[in-house]
Amino acid sequence: MDLINQIKNTLIVSCQAIGDEPLNDSYVLSKMAYALVLGGSKVLRLSQVEHIKAVKQVVDVPIIGLIKKHYDNSEVFITPTIKEVDQLVDLKVDIIALDATLRTRPDQDLTNLVKTIKTKYPNQLLLADCSSVEDAINAQNLGFDLIASTLRGSTKQTKGHNNLENNYQFLRDLKKVITKPIIAEGGIWTPQQAKEILNLGIHSVVVGTAITRLHSIVKYWNDILK
């Protein structure tokens, strides 16, 4: 079974930390990744070279890899240039996630970046992190293998919107126009939500904050209990 079919109807757990986040430590994240796999996670979404290296030493599951890198001349920070792609290929991640919004990139535009990747690494699976239907259609046309809703609400154009509003309307809209497998990511907090999303025909769901960001989980509980 190929990897894309293998991850159908599965829970993908995002296990990431950067900057001053309290769990931003390769050893800590490797232990968390081990616990996630112990609990049944069959795919992980990971960022940053050292973290991915550490996790790969303790678990053997498919990895969706990305590198978060900020450049002064662009808002795009998820695997923004070919340099980050090269690093991820060297790490042998199974799928590379890239920002696939229509925003200005720090180096090549998205069209040329994808062309470069497909020339250098023709067998590399690519996942498009999108914020809008327009992003998703463009990414599909460029040849991305998977389309994700990761950046919904994270761009100026989609600020204030999310994947859950209006009974998952954005995900429903994607289903109408996207033929590639769709990955739902962003704002999913409960197993019930994940199940409802999968029942829409979405390929799989990614959950990060609700499982792996302990400070956010405690805040979520406290906000409800107030």
From Swiss-Prot:
Keywords noted in UniProt: Carbohydrate metabolism, Isomerase
GO biological process terms on file: carbohydrate metabolic process; N-acetylmannosamine catabolic process; N-acetylneuraminate catabolic process
EC number(s) given by UniProt: 5.1.3.9
Keyword field contains Isomerase: yes
SUPFAM superfamilies tied to this protein: Ribulose-phoshate binding barrel
Source species, domain of life: Bacteria
Reactions it catalyzes: an N-acyl-D-glucosamine 6-phosphate = an N-acyl-D-mannosamine 6-phosphate
Pathway assigned in UniProt: Amino-sugar metabolism; N-acetylneuraminate degradation; D-fructose 6-phosphate from N-acetylneuraminate: step 3/5
Cellular component terms per the entry's GO annotation: cytosol
InterPro entries (alphabetical): Aldolase_TIM, NanE, RibuloseP-bd_barrel
Family according to the record: Belongs to the NanE family.
NCBIfam families xref list: PRK01130.1
Protein name according to UniProt: Putative N-acetylmannosamine-6-phosphate 2-epimerase
Originating organism: Mycoplasma capricolum subsp. capricolum (strain California kid / ATCC 27343 / NCTC 10154)
